[in-house]
């Protein structure tokens, strides 16, 4: 019994370093918010301007990797000996469900405003040209390109899971073919895992920092409770307590049911917006935007604005590519887990088609609605953001729809459930990654899960205290830098091992 406890307890070398690093950064930030904002602006400017090109080339190279997987020698290789665990319809639905987080609802509702008010390519703000390129850029940032780049990592993890039968809970486990077992399980592997965990903690904290204001603004609209930082902190605390109760009482089945509810409610809410906002305009705008995307795609892929220095690619494209990089391992592990028995080609095509459809639907419907409200002078979004913040502006885009009270209740429930499941997933992923071997069917220790959910909650509160989107963007970009190299190493390790193992099969 004693040995079992030791086996399933924390792994000190990957538990304490991220905890200490993140704790110190939070303490330094809270100690002087003004100084922290100065540092944040400097870090953001340095990474995006000096190293932004690297993120763009990373995405382009990984896109070529997708074509190699689909049409290359491994295209028909099966990821596991079993038949697919899920039907194709269920598989695609699970992919869609993974895209309906509160952070996605945040960006989907407001992103187009930023693209129109500060457009790329030297276009005039709020001009016809800016509006034409607005949704096209959303389709670029959340379309086939980033999902194609996830294919390589998803295939890699599925290969290690189901072909090589490796128990992978941290990225270092996949690096044995590349650097050898000694280094993968030694100091080098520990450093890689700590980079991954610190970045993942900040990524999850930023998602919480985006989601929480949506819920508290909904509460203000529905119940008249003023939105303050204290209310944000109270709501996050309630979520953490609710998560702890669910874990302690064995209510994980209830959390899974809530996750399914989130998916169905997402369909319902998007369908409602599509119908009442203007289905004909949305379809016309989407069609036009696909054409604009195809016309400008080469420039979008390589756009750094080195001469004009308008800042658009640094503020958005580099930021989003870092966002995709930082979530790549976590998301790819999930996609690999649900893809057992699929061929490499099936997984690559399924991801690009299924996941692109989900994100394009979200951004097209929500972005078109926001644009219509601006064009019809129903909402003054710049004024709302200046006086009340971004979250209030997002809430008002939903409140402006017919049956506003019912719509707001639906949006409130959707955001609340999405954030509950987010915290549950955060605590589970971090606990699994920082504990010794946890067998199938077992849960990581309760206190470890609660501890990580508390830390993620603290990061969310700190980012909210800093105010604005820049701290959130900087946290993502800073976290994406080390994972940039980790993702490349995992990819190279897969290529090296598959070249030997799949050579004669």
UniProtKB/Swiss-Prot annotation:
It is found in: Cell inner membrane. One of its GO terms (molecular function) is (R)-carnitine:4-(trimethylammonio)butanoate antiporter activity. Homotrimer. NCBIfam families: bcct, PRK03356.1. Catalyzes the exchange of L-carnitine for gamma-butyrobetaine. This is L-carnitine/gamma-butyrobetaine antiporter. Its main location: membrane. Pfam families: BCCT. Keywords: Antiport, Cell inner membrane, Cell membrane, Membrane, Transmembrane, Transmembrane helix, Transport. Pathway: Amine and polyamine metabolism; carnitine metabolism. Belongs to the BCCT transporter (TC 2.A.15) family. CaiT subfamily. The lineage of its organism: Bacteria, Pseudomonadati, Pseudomonadota, Gammaproteobacteria, Enterobacterales. GO terms for biological process: 4-(trimethylammonio)butanoate transport; carnitine metabolic process. InterPro entries: BCCT_CS (IPR018093), BCCT_transptr (IPR000060), BCCT_transptr_CaiT (IPR023449). It catalyses: 4-(trimethylamino)butanoate(in) + (R)-carnitine(out) = 4-(trimethylamino)butanoate(out) + (R)-carnitine(in). HAMAP family: CaiT. The chain crosses the membrane at residues 10-30, 51-71, 92-112, 143-163, 195-215, 231-251, 263-283, 316-336, 347-367, 403-423, 446-466, 475-495. It is a multi-pass membrane protein. It comes from Salmonella paratyphi A (strain AKU_12601).
């Amino acid at each position: 019994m004693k040995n079992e406890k030791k086996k399933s307890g924390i792994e000190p070398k990957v538990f304490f370093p991220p905890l200490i690093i993140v704790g110190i950064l939070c303490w330094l930030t809270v100690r002087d918010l003004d100084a922290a904002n100065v540092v944040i602006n400097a870090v953001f400017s340095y990474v995006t301007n000096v190293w932004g090109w690297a993120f763009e080339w990373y995405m382009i190279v990984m896109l070529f990797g997708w074509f190699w997987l689909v049409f290359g020698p491994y295209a028909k290789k099966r990821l596991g000996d079993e038949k697919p665990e899920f039907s194709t319809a269920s598989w695609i639905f699970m992919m869609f469900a993974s895209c309906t987080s509160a952070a996605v609802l945040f960006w989907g509702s407001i992103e187009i405003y930023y693209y129109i008010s500060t457009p790329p390519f030297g276009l005039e703000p709020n001009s016809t040209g800016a509006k034409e390129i607005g949704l096209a850029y959303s389709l670029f940032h959340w379309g086939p390109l980033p999902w194609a780049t996830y294919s390589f990592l998803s295939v890699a993890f599925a290969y290690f899971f189901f072909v090589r039968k490796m128990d992978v809970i941290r990225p270092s486990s996949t690096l044995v073919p590349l650097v050898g077992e000694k280094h993968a399980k030694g100091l080098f592997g520990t450093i890689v895992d700590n980079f991954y965990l610190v970045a993942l903690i900040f990524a999850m904290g930023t998602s919480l920092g985006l989601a929480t204001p949506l819920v508290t603004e909904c509460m203000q609209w529905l119940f008249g409770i003023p939105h303050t930082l204290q209310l944000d902190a109270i709501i996050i605390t309630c979520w953490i307590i609710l998560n702890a109760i669910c874990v302690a009482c064995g209510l994980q089945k209830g959390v899974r049911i809530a996750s399914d509810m989130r998916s169905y409610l997402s369909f319902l809410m998007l369908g409602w917006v599509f119908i009442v906002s203007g289905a004909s305009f949305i379809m016309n705008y989407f069609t036009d935007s696909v054409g604009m995307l195809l016309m400008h795609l080469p420039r979008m892929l390589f756009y750094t604005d080195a001469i004009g220095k308008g800042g658009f690619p640094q503020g958005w494209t580099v930021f989003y590519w870092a966002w995709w990089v930082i979530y790549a391992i976590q998301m790819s592990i999930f996609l690999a887990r649900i893809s057992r028995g699929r061929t490499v080609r099936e997984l690559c095509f399924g991801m690009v088609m299924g996941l692109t459809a989900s994100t394009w639907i979200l951004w097209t419907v929500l972005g078109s609605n926001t644009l219509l409200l601006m064009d019809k002078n129903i909402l003054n979004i710049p004024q709302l953001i200046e006086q009340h913040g971004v979250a209030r502006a997002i809430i008002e885009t939903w409140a402006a729809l017919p049956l506003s009270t019912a719509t707001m209740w639906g949006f409130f429930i959707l955001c609340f459930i999405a954030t509950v499941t987010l915290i549950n997933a955060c605590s589970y992923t971090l606990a699994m990654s920082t504990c010794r071997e946890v067998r199938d069917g077992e849960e990581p220790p309760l206190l470890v899960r609660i501890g990580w959910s508390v830390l993620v909650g603290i990061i969310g509160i700190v980012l909210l205290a800093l105010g604005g989107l820049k701290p959130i963007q900087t946290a993502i970009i800073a976290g994406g830098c080390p994972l940039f190299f980790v993702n490349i190493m995992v990819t190279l390790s897969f290529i090296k091992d598959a070249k030997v193992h799949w050579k004669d099969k």
